Design a protein with these regions (language model features):
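Ligand-binding loop in jelly-roll beta-barrel domains
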Residues: 79, 99-126
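Conserved, surface-exposed functional patches that form binding/active-site neighborhoods
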Residues: 122-141
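A short, N-terminal "cap"/entry segment at the start of jelly-roll beta-barrel domains
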Residues: 1-45, 136-178
Length: 178
């Protein structure tokens, strides 16, 4: 574990314990903020993020992956767009996405949300992620204009609007007391 100005970062192998409020976070503009507990070396088999979304913010762009993912809403309300259908989610709703399931989660208008995201590491170009065009996701600002496997293309508008360094310390009050 190594200390940074924004919190501890895991760069080695082996077990560790870190509190999300002590860890560093990534501010992503319209994609909210997230803590993934990883440093330069990603976990090889499993990704895990805590996503804090402001009203109308989304976890990402509408996509499918070739690895399974799971999402647990810890606080707030969200809209799940899955296979071009909308489902409303509230605290403690769990979503399981088998490999290949198109999806995205967007915080409800007027309300923040906290979502735990867990996924197997995919294989292939871009980790096996394909960003898809969806009229339903577009209503939430979460559709790409053209299908792609290139995350730089899928998130070009978001990245262009972000400052150069987006790592930040935990924002007090972002996580609910459970």
């Amino acid at each position: 574990m190594r200390e940074t100005k924004n919190g501890p970062v895991v760069d080695g192998e082996g077990w560790f314990v870190v509190n999300a409020q002590d860890s560093r976070w990534r501010e992503m503009g319209p994609l909210g903020a997230y803590c993934n507990f990883e440093g330069k070396r990603r976990f090889p088999q499993l990704g895990i993020n805590i996503n804090v979304l402001g009203p109308g913010e989304r976890i990402g762009m509408y996509h499918r992956e070739n690895a399974q993912e799971g999402f647990l809403v810890l606080a707030g309300e969200c809209t799940l767009v899955i296979e071009d259908q909308e489902r409303q989610l509230t605290a403690w709703d769990f979503v399981h996405c088998p490999p290949g399931t198109p999806h995205i989660i967007v915080a409800a208008e007027g309300q923040s949300a906290v979502v735990l995201a867990v996924g197997g590491r995919g294989r292939g170009v871009g980790g096996g992620v394909r960003y898809l065009v969806s009229d339903v996701a577009a209503r939430h600002g979460a559709s790409v204009g053209e299908e792609t496997t290139d995350p730089s293309a899928a998130y070009a508008d978001v990245y262009a609007a972000l400052p150069r360094s987006t790592w930040a310390p935990y924002r007090d009050g972002s996580l609910p007391s459970l």
